[in-house]
Amino acid sequence: MKEFLEITKGLSDATRVRALLSLRGGELCLCQIIETLRLSPSTVSKHMDVLCRAGLVDRRKEGHWHFFRLACRNGAPAARRSLRWVLEALKDEPVLEADSRKLRGVRRKNLKAVTACYRRS
């Protein structure tokens, strides 16, 4: 029951679904997700924590940087089935298509330029 509730919580917010689906093309740094969604770092970070707890997303840390990817291979079977369902159900969603266009631009940028949110003053 707990796993089900975590997954449904992860999928119950439009911003989390947008963040989740931004990972369709592969691993992203938190700052790339922030730039794509155009939300504050703390907001995106909290959403990514929920997705990780749900088992929908894997996280790795490299220095101050946090990288995320879909938990396709390592996730629990229920999380993997949920991911497949979301990908299929929302494949033609206009907001997600707009996010994909933004993300293509973000991916073309130098990662150091995008990760400016990690630089300390």
Can you name each region flagged by the protein language model?
Residues 9, 18-21, 52, 58, ...:
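A cross-family signal for key residues in well-ordered alpha-helices
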Residues 1-2, 121:
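Short, low-complexity, intrinsically disordered N-terminal peptides in bacterial proteins
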Residues 2-43, 65-75:
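N-terminal helix-turn-helix DNA-binding core of bacterial DNA-binding proteins
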Residues 35, 52-53:
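Alpha-helical residues within the helix-turn-helix
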Residues 25, 41, 53, 74-121:
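C-terminal regulatory/oligomerization modules of transcriptional regulators
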Residues 48-49:
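Short, hydrophobic-biased segments on the C-terminal half of alpha helices
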Residues 53-62, 69-71:
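Beta-hairpin "wing" of winged helix-turn-helix
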